[in-house]
Amino acid sequence: MLLLALSDAHIPDRATDLPVKFKKLLSVPDKISQVALLGNSTKSYDFLKFVNQISNNITIVRGEFDNGHLPSTKKDKASDNSRPMEEIPMNSIIRQGALKIGCCSGYTVVPKNDPLSLLALARQLDVDILLWGGTHNVEAYTLEGKFFVNPGSCTGAFNTDWPIVFDVEDSDEAVTSEVDKPTKENQSEDDDAKGGSTGKEQPGSYTPKEGTAGERENENESNVKPENQFKEDEVDMSDSDINGSNSPSFCLLDIQGNTCTLYIYLYVNGEVKVDKVVYEKE
């Protein structure tokens, strides 16, 4: 059984469509048994129509930017034209073979994307595999016998809470060391205050330096630092790092008995790359 996991399409707010190569890969009829939409993927009718063509067995969970309700696929008996509204659940469970698969968007997990919080949710749902979205980044790891999979954003939409890491501890240590370290000026002032009659210069006194005016001018020029020394180092950042966008990705789970083979599809530089991870229930 093949289970397709899609998340965070954000169509039409942040993206227009799936990559063309993704659509060609997923357009094979009668190949994928079920589709899981893990949030932020219900605002585009064309996208939902395409997903329904992949498989009419679709599990949808509510994302942070989804509406609370979605038109039902079943027509209302009282009226042939209207369709009742169905509430989109926060969590859902899929049972395939010997495995139970939990689905959630992940924005209700606090702290967000925290492995221990996700483990607590997996235990609460009593599932072997937990699929979650909301971060726009692909992740797959095993924790205490449970398998955690995040398919990323299928369109590569930008993430508003894209993390930026600063080395705060290192900078604090550097500042502390500079503050604690006595400067030469402070040492000289202390020596002058203690010197008294030792023949050292007193505050406010001035003793002209020996040498010609030309020598003194050359010495002053040598002490001037070049302008290039004050320029900051240029940081090499890609466009995706600047605008917070991500590489489009999705996951395909091949479930056979108590074994799950995960295929991770990444769209990088116009090419589709595939990684494989195998999980077996203990």
Swiss-Prot record:
A single BP term in Gene Ontology: endocytic recycling
Renumbered residue ranges of the record's region Disordered: 173-242
Pfam families, per the entry: Metallophos_2
Keywords: Protein transport, Transport
Gene3D superfamilies per the UniProt record, alphabetical: 3.60.21.10
A GO CC term attached to the entry: retromer complex
InterPro entries (UniProt xref): Calcineurin-like_PHP_lpxH, Metallo-depent_PP-like, Phosphodiesterase_MJ0936/Vps29
Compositionally biased region (Basic and acidic residues): 178-187, 212-232
Domain of life according to the entry: Eukaryota
Assembly, per entry: Component of the retromer complex which consists of VPS29, VPS26, VPS35, VPS5 and VPS17. Component of a retromer subcomplex consisting of VPS29, VPS26 and VPS35.
Described function: Plays a role in vesicular protein sorting. Required for the endosome-to-Golgi retrieval of the vacuolar protein sorting receptor VPS10. Component of the membrane-associated retromer complex which is essential in endosome-to-Golgi retrograde transport. The VPS29-VPS26-VPS35 subcomplex may be involved in cargo selection.
Family: Belongs to the VPS29 family.
Note: Present with 259 molecules/cell in log phase SD medium.
NCBIfam families documented for this protein: yfcE
Protein name listed in UniProt: Vacuolar protein sorting-associated protein 29
UniProt source species: Saccharomyces cerevisiae (strain ATCC 204508 / S288c) (Baker's yeast)
Source species taxonomy: Eukaryota, Fungi, Dikarya, Ascomycota, Saccharomycotina
